[in-house]
Amino acid sequence: MKQYRPDTTCIHAGYTPGNGEPRVLPIVQSTTYTYDSSKEMGDLFDLKADGFFYTRLGNPTLDAVEKKLAALEGGVGALVTSSGQAATMMAVLNICHAGGHVVCSNAVYGGTFNLFYKTLHEMGIDCTFVSPNCTEDELNAAFRETTRCVFAETLTNPSLVVTDLEMFANAAHAHGVPCIVDNTFPTPINCRPFEFGVDIVTHSTTKYLDGHAVQLGGAIVDSGNFDWNNGKFPEFTEPDESYHGIVYAEHFGKAAYIAKARCHLMRDIGAQAAPMNAFYLNLGMETLALRMERHCSNAQKIAEFLEQDDRVAWVNYPGLESSPYHELAMKYMPHGTCGVISFGIKGGREAATRFMDSLELASVVTHVADLRTCVLHPASTTHRQMTDEQLKEAGVSPDLIRLSVGIENPEDILDDIKQALEKATK
């Protein structure tokens, strides 16, 4: 397919109907697929041929969405999963095993922090957390001989720190390991991490990519740029006995990482997305570019208002010139960051609660990044499993309100915020 600009790619990539075929991506709601001979089926199981034989490993609807995601990010392949957490876990387990080590930003989504801090530790994988604001020397000091990857979020949730992608990627490569980033908040419309040296991207597709809070899902996208032949990753360069001795780096070339994630981990873990969810995700992605433009313009307007209001103690939005991350945002996301703002109002945690309870248009929900404006208090919800010290290190203060600005008329959103501020600060 011709390489189009991102907004056109959102609509057309992944699925090209033939003569007399449906114009809209069909839902192939089937677990299995028929073939004329046992040999054809055997070749599929041995990875000697392309095709679908069981939806856990591939499905026409999922395949179209994966191709669209890969095209948007500029990668060689993608794998959709049942959730963003599944994508993060599989992205790491694909290259890191018991006895291994990961370097991870400490300013990440609470569930991601617990995955690295607790669950992977119980599986024998250690993690060293670093601040996304760390210096190059501090970052390099976190590596060990057993380090197998670096993980960070492009824009951290909910503290909205802009990660220096080139610094993290360069450090990873200097130690012979790939850099993985979660690109959920900016989406490939606003940031393409592969252009800055990142090797693997993950997404919670539940958020902006879907955009309507309809489907739960995740994705892994492979740039195809990392060289697995450096001696640190024998799982790619030595025979996999569970697939009759296939060597992923030889057989799949630049797509070795994403092929192994599908053939090995998805086979064994089974965290596959449902075809219906992939269909909804595709519908959402068709309007992604339009929605992100509105999310960002609305958020900019709201952030500028909050910055000037005396009842507001502080505001963090990378689009503001006053943000300490504005320069990095302009480097990595020059056309906009996302629709999420973090801020605190005078009166602390109690005032934050009164503010959220007073909102009429915006909803208080455990969600972020869909077309409806919503708010959340992360310290008592998404990050409540973290200690006070961990919250501080992650940039989640007790008064932090996470405001996910939707695509409603910005004046209506402003009116709602103004009346809630009035009630919260009486």
What residue spans do the PLM features occupy?
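N-terminal "arm"/small-domain region of PLP-dependent enzymes with the aminotransferase-like
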Residues: M1-N59, K67-K68
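Basic/polar N-terminal segments that are highly enriched at the extreme N-terminus
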Residues: M1-T9, E307, E422-K426
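Conserved PLP-enzyme active-site core in the AAT-like
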Residues: D7-T16, A78-Q308
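Conserved N-terminal alpha-helix of the aminotransferase class I/II PLP-enzyme fold
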Residues: S37-M89, G111-L120
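PLP-dependent enzyme catalytic core of the Aspartate aminotransferase-like
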Residues: G99, Y117-K118, M123-C127, A141, ...
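Well-ordered beta-strand positions enriched in small/hydrophobic/aromatic, beta-favoring residues
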Residues: V150, G218-I220, V315, I341, ...
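Conserved small-domain helix->loop->beta segment predominantly found in fold-type I
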Residues: I269-Q272, N277-A278, L283, T287, ...
